[in-house]
Every structure is written in structure tokens, then in C-alpha cells.
């Protein structure tokens, strides 16, 4: 099906086109029908509770839905492996003729992370005459000035240009500032503003540029960089101010875009810069590896990566300029969107029919929250953008491989079925169901972690199985909170210099904890009413004993591994790391 659709599309020449397959309505019907049938089949398998495997002696059973999820994980892992192997075998050339603008979005960044970011950008291995470096700071007050000073220090001796802009591209003039008889419009770019002319002149004539502008959010900052660049470069690279680039990060992404004119964007492998700050940051480092090298690698096999990550991504500039205004003015339920900037950029590329890729050869290291509350706020924000962008992405399924439709449906319904399964088991009235649920969660996580160990060649990935508890107790309820507050754009992130004070995401966790505790209490109470002297209950008691011992032993072993392997050995080793390419893949 992918090949048929591809045959109907033309390779872009000059101005990029919106690549529609022939008979788009027919393809839409086919893809949407497939999605509906897939959803109905999975739902029917879940509701029917058909048992594929059942063993009364050990109280074990595997339903059709569980088997389907196992097959999904196996397929995803297989395609990820094939993609990584393909990339490893390929030796793509680089012409070093394409011009690149490396754009950095910054907002009250931790000076320690910012200096690492700027220095890594300075030493990126790409011809200086082909590379621009642009830092746009979201804020123009005295509290933001330190970022510009650091930029000047790092790029001292280079072709540097700086400008403190009192406004931004969408500053609204006050009535007294407007000429008599004119009518100011809300959020209308001030094309005649001298600040705009100054910014664009600096960006197009200087190699290293730093702009401080009126606060407007990350999307406003990114818009300034993209708009000021105009058509002066071939590719635009995005980067966050807390990200440290590998020396080859830029050139490896350029290679991918040069290899095929149908590739509209490419993302790289984002690792964690501060994995040993806390348990949260360490688990995030393992989760990031899985997200990029399994999930996005699988999507890249089918040329449909769903999100080019903000810390490390690259876009064809001629495509980006086509949808720049539409991207900036995105609305959802009548409200301007301030979250999900990177995911919507990716979706805009996909909406035009261009392919999106991932390469693990391009690498960067980004800061992640080390405190639980800040991490939870981050995950809630990402989940909001996921649900919103899912609706947008569904409009363009017919332009890409059918895998995109399949994965979109499966990933969307997964948390709802997991929630239903948990509630159904803990309120079944038997303690064994609760223990079996806990065992199943960790067994499945352990199998996935073992595969990751093999794929990465590092036993540290065994600890990835611990992430399942973070998901079940934190991420799962936060998904419902994100869904219910989808149109609330004010609850976002803050600069690294500030402490997150948004405690709202704790509310769904409290409700979820009450539901779980209520279910466990109900099952214990109901089981205590039964006669445990019967042969069936005696056998169940043995299973309960073995299950509980096994579960406790698992956590003891994992806790010891984490404490000895990570907290002591790896942290000491990480303190000797000074250069980005010296940062170990993970301590062994």
C-alpha cells in the first residue's frame, strides 16, 4: 500500500508542493476504514475475554487482547531493529554545500546548561561559512540579559550580532502609538517595525546572532528565528537552550535530508544530560532511549516519525516557510495553541506528504526534570499536545504508510484499556487478581527491558522495567487530567531558574490512588469472607505466597542494582566526563 501511494507522488522541484496521492478521497476511505476495523477488532477481543492460553494449575491465562499487545511489541521491536541496522550499514555522503541555520530557543535557562549548549554549538563540525547560529531569548528584561552576555563570551571573536528588541513579530501597538485613522489588529505582524528590519538584517548578514525580545512563549521565539531566516538557508536545525550537541549532530542530519528529496524533516537521538541527579532523571534517561531507539526508529522504518524532538531536529527550510504562518496561528477549540510546538511542526511536514526520519547517528544531550512535580508537569504538557495533534495527524493518514494509521490507533486506545483492566482486576474481589496484575506488569516490563539490553548492548536497560510503576501510578492518571484540561494552555513549564509551583497534576494522582486503594481493600475484604480451608483456596494461598515472594524479591534485586550500579559506580564515573562525545552510552 505504501508503494502504491508513493508511485502517485512527484519528487518536489523548486517550490515544495502539497503531495496528494491520486484519488485522495478513496485513500481516505481505505485508511479510515482500516482504523475503524482495527479499533473494533481490538475492542471486541478485549470485551469478549477470549482466552488463548489457560492453565488452571498455576492460575495463568492469556487473553486475545493480551496476545495482540504482545504481537504489537514484537513487531515494533523488529522494525526498530531493522531500521537501526539499515542506518548502521549505510554510509551516506555529505556534500557540505547546504547552508544550515542552527536556531536555539531560550527562556531563563540555567547558566550551567546554557554555557554547555552554546559551547557545543560553537564546536559543531560543519563548515563555518555554511552554518549560522541564532539564539532567540524569550524575554528582554534585566533578568534575561545574562543569556546574551554568555552568548557574547562564548562567541567572542566570531562574526557576532546582538539586538535587544522591545517587541516581537506580533507585538500589538497601543492606540496612542497608532497613526490617526488607522485600526490596529490583534496579533498582526508589524511589517514596518524597525525592530523587524534590524533582526532580519542581523540574522541574514551575521553568522552568530543573539536576539532578546518581548516575552511571548516558545512558539513566538521559534517564529522569530524562522521568519528572520527567510529563504537565506537550505535547512533549519532546532535546539533548546538546555541541550548539548554532539560534534556530528548537524552533519548526520544533513546527510539524511540530502539523501532523499522526499524527506522533509529528520530527528536525532536525544539522551539525558543529567541522568544521575535523581531516580526520576535516571528513569527518564532509560525511557528516552526506548522512545527514540525503539519507538521512533520503528516509525522511521516507515518514513513517518510522529514528532521531531525540539532539542535535536532539522527541517527543509523551503517546506517550513510554506506553513510557517499556519503553524504559528494554530488554534484548538478557538484558543491559540501554546503547547506542542515541535509535534505540530512535524505534523505540518507530514500533512504536505513529505517523509520524516530518525537517525541515531545524530546525538544530543538534554536536561530533564529531576524533581517529581516538574517531571509530572512536563509529561502532562506533552500528553495534552499528543491528544490534540492526534486529531490533526489523523487527517493525513492517507498520505503515508498504513503503519502510521495502525500505530496511531493502538497507541491512542492503549491507556484506556490498561485503565479498564486495572480497575476490573482490583475490584474482582480476589487478592490473587491484584497480585497477578502486579506480576504481569513487571513481567511484561522485564521482557521489554531484556530486549532493550540486547539492542543497546548494555545491561543497565534491565532497570527500565522499573519505569512501569512510574507509568501506572503517575503517567496513566495524568493522561486523563491532560484530556480533561486539553484547552487549558496556561499550565506549562517555567524557566530552569524558577521552581515549578503548579500542583494541579497532583489531583488526578490522588483520585487514582484512592481508586486503587479502594479496589485493593475491597478485594481483601471479599476474599476474607471466603472459606480458605477448601482445596482450591489452599492452592491459591500457595500461589499468593510464591507470587508475593517473587514480587518482593524482584524489587529488592532492582533496588540493589540501582543503588550499587547507578548511585555509586555510575555517578562517580560521570563526574570525570568533560566533553559531550566522552559521555558514556551508560555505565557498564
From Swiss-Prot:
> Which positions, given as ranges, span the membrane?
29-49, 62-82, 412-432, 434-454, 457-477, 506-526, 544-564
| Phylogenetic placement of the source organism | Eukaryota, Metazoa, Chordata, Craniata, Vertebrata
Primary localisation category: membrane
For this chain's UniProt record, which GO biological process terms are given? extracellular matrix assembly; hyaluronan biosynthetic process; polysaccharide biosynthetic process
For membrane topology, the record states: Multi-pass membrane protein
User: What EC number(s) are associated with this protein in UniProt?
Assistant: 2.4.1.212
The cellular component terms of Gene Ontology attached to this UniProt record, alphabetical and capped at eight, are:
plasma membrane
Provide the top EC class. Answer: transferase
Name this protein carries in UniProt: Hyaluronan synthase 1
This protein's UniProt keywords:
Glycosyltransferase, Membrane, Transferase, Transmembrane, Transmembrane helix
Pfam families reported for this sequence: Glyco_tranf_2_3
Q: Which cofactor does it need?
A: Mg(2+)
On the Extracellular side, which residues? 50-61, 433, 478-505, 565-588
Record pathway: Glycan biosynthesis; hyaluronan biosynthesis
**Which family does the entry's similarity section mention?**
Belongs to the NodC/HAS family.
Role: Catalyzes the addition of GlcNAc or GlcUA monosaccharides to the nascent hyaluronan polymer. Therefore, it is essential to hyaluronan synthesis a major component of most extracellular matrices that has a structural role in tissues architectures and regulates cell adhesion, migration and differentiation. Also able to catalyze the synthesis of chito-oligosaccharide depending on the substrate.
Amino acid at each position: 500500500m505504501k508503494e502504491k501511494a508513493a508511485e502517485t507522488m512527484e519528487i518536489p522541484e523548486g517550490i515544495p508542493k502539497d503531495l496528494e496521492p491520486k484519488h485522495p478521497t478513496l485513500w481516505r476511505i481505505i485508511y479510515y476504514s482500516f482504523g475503524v476495523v482495527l479499533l473494533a477488532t481490538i475492542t471486541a477481543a478485549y470485551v469478549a475475554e477470549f482466552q488463548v492460553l489457560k492453565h488452571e494449575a498455576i492460575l495463568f491465562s492469556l487473553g486475545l487482547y493480551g496476545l495482540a499487545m504482545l504481537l504489537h511489541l514484537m513487531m515494533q521491536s523488529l522494525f526498530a531493529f531493522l531500521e537501526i541496522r539499515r542506518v548502521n550499514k549505510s554510509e551516506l555522503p555529505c556534500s557540505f554545500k547546504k547552508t544550515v541555520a542552527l536556531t536555539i530557543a531560550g527562556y531563563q535557562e540555567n547558566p550551567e546548561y546554557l554555557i554547555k549548549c552554546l559551547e557545543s554549538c560553537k564546536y559543531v563540525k560543519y563548515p563555518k561559512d555554511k552554518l549560522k547560529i541564532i539564539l532567540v531569548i524569550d524575554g528582554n528584561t534585566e533578568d534575561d540579559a545574562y543569556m546574551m552576555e554568555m552568548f557574547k563570551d562564548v562567541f567572542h571573536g566570531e562574526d557576532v550580532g546582538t539586538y535587544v528588541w522591545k517587541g516581537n513579530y506580533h507585538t500589538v501597538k497601543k492606540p496612542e502609538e497608532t497613526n490617526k485613522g488607522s485600526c490596529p489588529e490583534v496579533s498582526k505582524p508589524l511589517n514596518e517595525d524597525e525592530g523587524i528590519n534590524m533582526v532580519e538584517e542581523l540574522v541574514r548578514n551575521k553568522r552568530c546572532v543573539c536576539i532578546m525580545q518581548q516575552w511571548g512563549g516558545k512558539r513566538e521565539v521559534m517564529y522569530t528565528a524562522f521568519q528572520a531566516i527567510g529563504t537565506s538557508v537550505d535547512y533549519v536545525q532546532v535546539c533548546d537552550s538546555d541541550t548539548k550537541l554532539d560534534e556530528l549532530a548537524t552533519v548526520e542530519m544533513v546527510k539524511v535530508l540530502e539523501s532523499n528529496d522526499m524527506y522533509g524533516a529528520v530527528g536525532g537521538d536525544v539522551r539525558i544530560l543529567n541522568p544521575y541527579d535523581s531516580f526520576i532523571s535516571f528513569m527518564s534517561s532509560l525511557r528516552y532511549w526506548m522512545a527514540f531507539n525503539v519507538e521512533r526508529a520503528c516509525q522511521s522504518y516507515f518514513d513517518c516519525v510522529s514528532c521531531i524532538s525540539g532539542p535535536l531536529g532539522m527541517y527543509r527550510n523551503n517546506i517550513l516557510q510554506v506553513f510557517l504562518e499556519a503553524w504559528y496561528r494554530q488554534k484548538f477549540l478557538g484558543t491559540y495553541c501554546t503547547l506542542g510546538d515541535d509535534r505540530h511542526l512535524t505534523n505540518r511536514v507530514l500533512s504536505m506528504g513529505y517523509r520524516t526520519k530518525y537517525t541515531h547517528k545524530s546525538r544530543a544531550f538534554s536536561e530533564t526534570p529531576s524533581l517529581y512535580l516538574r517531571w509530572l508537569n512536563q509529561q502532562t504538557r506533552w500528553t495534552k499536545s499528543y491528544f490534540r495533534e492526534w486529531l490533526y495527524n489523523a487527517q493525513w493518514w492517507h498520505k503515508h504508510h498504513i503503519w502510521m494509521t495502525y500505530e496511531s490507533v493502538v497507541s491512542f486506545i492503549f491507556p484506556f484499556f490498561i485503565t479498564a483492566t486495572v480497575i476490573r482486576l482490583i475490584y474482582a474481589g480476589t487478592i490473587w487478581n491484584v497480585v497477578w496484575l502486579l506480576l504481569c506488569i513487571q513481567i511484561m516490563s522485564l521482557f521489554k527491558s531484556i530486549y532493550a539490553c540486547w539492542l543497546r548492548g548494555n545491561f543497565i536497560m534491565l532497570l527500565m522495567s522499573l519505569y512501569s510503576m512510574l507509568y501506572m501510578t503517575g503517567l496513566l492518571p495524568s493522561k486523563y487530567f491532560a484530556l480533561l484540561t486539553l484547552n487549558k494552555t496556561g499550565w506549562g513549564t517555567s524557566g530552569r531558574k524558577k521552581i515549578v509551583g503548579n500542583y494541579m497534576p497532583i489531583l488526578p494522582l490522588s483520585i487514582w490512588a484512592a481508586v486503587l486503594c479502594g479496589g485493593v481493600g475491597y478485594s481483601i475484604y471479599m476474599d476474607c469472607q471466603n472459606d480458605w480451608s477448601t482445596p482450591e483456596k489452599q492452592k491459591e494461598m500457595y500461589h499468593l505466597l510464591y507470587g508475593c515472594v517473587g514480587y518482593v524479591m524482584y524489587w529488592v534485586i532492582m533496588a540493589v542494582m540501582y543503588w550499587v550500579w547507578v548511585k555509586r559506580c555510575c555517578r562517580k564515573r560521570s563526574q570525570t566526563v568533560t566533553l559531550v562525545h566522552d559521555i558514556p552510552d551508560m555505565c557498564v
